[in-house]
């Protein structure tokens, strides 16, 4: 993986389905876990909640294993058009801001302050069908690294 793939249109690049594999490490305790599942990036439903905005609805679902216990997990985000085709404004499902994203160079670092914690995400695009995020979460009670690999499935 010797370089980054620039992305001219971030929403077009993300659209579709992805297989997801995530490792979660607690650097303070040494605990580790995994998530495996799928992520879809699709236009919002025309008649349901969220139909008043443009962009893509990101829905992730799968199984999260932590300290020997496996349970279902899911999350939803909104990827809205940003200040250019390579940019997106990423928001939580309820519309609160999460972070900006600009994949014009194929790599981007975003920060999200959350109370006393700081979430720093590094986004890397390898090719048309593979990308990765690495989130480092630090704060008084958190010292985590979450590494997620996405592989296009449709």
Please annotate each region the language model reported.
Residues 2-154:
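Soluble ligand-binding/transfer domains with enclosed cavities or grooves
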